[in-house]
């Protein structure tokens, strides 16, 4: 006898969804969490460079420059900009000639 004849097939009324109560609070909460997760994932993929630079450098503008000569301020600004530019070095820049 074949194994296929031994397998029980479900009857027609068991094919439907057993959880017909979609207004269950757990189902609603899971749906909301799933949608929020999807939105955050899409935003992360679109703006990952900005987001991670923000977390790395934060809102800090650096130490106070009160009483510091302008030449030293400019040197500090260049140094900070070079540090930010070095962070972008893992992106490949292709120039076509």
From Swiss-Prot:
Q: Which residues carry this modification: Phosphoserine?
A: 64, 93
Effect annotated for changing residue 61 to G: In strain: isolate A/Philippines/2/82/BS
Primary location group: virion
Those parts of the protein on the Intravirion side are 44-97
Which keywords does the record carry? Answer: Disulfide bond, Glycoprotein, Host cell membrane, Host membrane, Host-virus interaction, Hydrogen ion transport, Inhibition of host autophagy by virus, Ion channel, Ion transport, Lipoprotein, Membrane, Palmitate, Phosphoprotein, Signal-anchor, Transmembrane, Transmembrane helix, Transport, Viral ion channel, Virion
> Where are the membrane-spanning stretches?
23-43
UniProt-recorded Gene Ontology molecular function terms:
monoatomic ion channel activity; proton transmembrane transporter activity
The feature of type site (Seems to be involved in pH gating) is located at: 41
Tell me what the record says results from residue 70 to K. In strain: isolate A/Philippines/2/82/BS
Example GO biological process term? protein complex oligomerization
Using the UniProt annotation, give all residue ranges assigned to the region (Disordered): 59-88
Q: Where is the lipid attached (S-palmitoyl cysteine)?
A: 50
Q: Which family does it belong to?
A: Belongs to the influenza viruses matrix protein M2 family.
Q: Additional comments on file?
A: When the channel is activated, one or more imidazole moieties of His-37 probably become bi-protonated.
Looking up HAMAP family in the UniProt record yields: INFV_M2
Protein name from the UniProt record: Matrix protein 2
Question: Lineage from the top down?
Answer: Viruses, Riboviria, Orthornavirae, Negarnaviricota, Polyploviricotina
Name the gene behind this protein. M
